[in-house]
Every structure is written in C-alpha cells, then in structure tokens.
Amino acid sequence: MNLAAYYPVLLFLLVGTGLGIALVSIGKILGPNKPDSEKNAPYECGFEAFEDARMKFDVRYYLVAILFIIFDLETAFLFPWGVALREIGWPGFIAMMIFLLEFLLGFAYIWKKGGLDWE
C-alpha cells in the first residue's frame, strides 16, 4: 500500500489543527478579559433567572430524537439507491427490499412497543 498519496491529507489535517489552535490561543491571550460581578451574573432577558437553567427533560424527548436520527439515516439510503437503480440491477433491488423489510419490521416493533406514543 502506497501511503505517499495520503501525505496531502495529513498535511491538511496538521495545518488545519495547528491554525485552529493558534487562532484560539491568540484570541485568549490578546483578547480583553475584565470579569466583574455584573458580567458573571446570571442573565435572562433583562431579568434575574426565574429557575435553574438545568431543567430535566423527559426521556421521551431523547427517545424521539434517537428514533428520528435512525429513521432519517435509513431514509437517506433510499436516495442514492434510487439514482443508481439501473446500474445495480436485480441484486441491488433485492438487497434494498431486504433493507426496507428490516426498516418496516423495526418500525412495526417500535410502534407495537409504544415508542411512538407520547403518553
């Protein structure tokens, strides 16, 4: 395996990381930093904070977010498949039908377990 082809990528990563660290460091060193009690006070729309900013969220929010990401990712696989359907032929069609069957089985399982019910 010829690793010389990856040297530009490595150089790009090193320069990008170094430049990012350098710019953040320069901003921290040269930027004005004069904290006082007013600047460190909690602020919420011109008023003192009414309650703790760290409210607990219901676990269902996270469940809905995870389910959305999973199903959105599965749906994203449909677009390249639709574009390349003529080139991949029957094997690609059968593979995608198996994928969609697994997708529908997962959707039915989540629906049956109540993952889509809010109450």
UniProtKB/Swiss-Prot annotation:
UniProt membrane topology term: Multi-pass membrane protein
Membrane-spanning intervals of the chain: 7-27, 63-83, 88-108
Entry keywords, A to Z: Cell inner membrane, Cell membrane, Membrane, NAD, Quinone, Translocase, Transmembrane, Transmembrane helix, Transport, Ubiquinone
Places the protein is found: Cell inner membrane
Paired cysteines (S-S): none
InterPro entries to which the protein is assigned, alphabetical: NAD(P)H_OxRDtase_bac/plastid, NADH_UbQ/plastoQ_OxRdtase_su3, NDAH_ubi_oxred_su3_sf
Molecular function (Gene Ontology), one example: NADH dehydrogenase (ubiquinone) activity
Subunit record text: NDH-1 is composed of 14 different subunits. Subunits NuoA, H, J, K, L, M, N constitute the membrane sector of the complex.
Record's function text: NDH-1 shuttles electrons from NADH, via FMN and iron-sulfur (Fe-S) centers, to quinones in the respiratory chain. The immediate electron acceptor for the enzyme in this species is believed to be ubiquinone. Couples the redox reaction to proton translocation (for every two electrons transferred, four hydrogen ions are translocated across the cytoplasmic membrane), and thus conserves the redox energy in a proton gradient.
Name of this chain's protein: NADH-quinone oxidoreductase subunit A
Organism: Burkholderia mallei (strain ATCC 23344)
